[in-house]
């Protein structure tokens, strides 16, 4: 007679409690891009680590809401919701009243390029819109269910606003690819006038800026199409470095193909990543690297969220940024700038 484990335990009087342990999420590749959330349309994905050591994701969803997702491992994402939308702004009606002609042309309000941060013990978000008004808001939670408006409508129009907190605690706004301006610690206003920054050799691009600091070097990322013309070629990420945030900055360098308006961020293990998304006609990475029509917008990113492993190193007293997936690492033959 066969004795099952259950019968054996009954006979011997041993009581055991079994727990089903979920399989550990497989670590993301450090040599190839990973595509996630394939059913979710998004642009401008932004990822930050919160004080609870969770990753938080937001992005443009083509509507007036700011979606927020959460993850412990960058692979498995839980949608927290879309609690914040532009209708929550105290000056939302002012926007509608002042942009009636633009609304006829563009339709209802749409929230563009949101970014969220945890700065000075509170959550902070910035975004722009299709109706010539940007916003900076604060909240006690990453969902931004309840918000404060430290600058209200006086924040004005900022093209793809982004924030950077320096090691000395100063907070800077980056926008317009690029202009920087210091913010007050409580976000109620600006300190000083805007400062224009430029690569030494050419224009950086037209949108999607970010500044990080590696050692004592400032690394400024910006976005442009490879042909330097809107929606011509591939949507790429470039960078320049400086010893001071105000510059002078180095020549423009190549960060990654099809990484335009991506977030450069460091994970909990100290690895660097860049977010990416579909912008243009999709073609496989192999097809893109064989060559693209320079007159058509083309992307090797599928719909959803793409995470591309990156290398950021200090070499010869400068910063070298490189995509570790070789499909993203080199500019295309159609690239206007020669690197």
Where are these regions (language model features)?
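Positively charged n-region of N-terminal signal peptides that target proteins for export
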Residues: 1-7
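Carbohydrate-active catalytic/glycan-binding domains of CAZyme proteins
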Residues: 25-339
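Bacterial N-terminal signal peptides
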Residues: 8-19
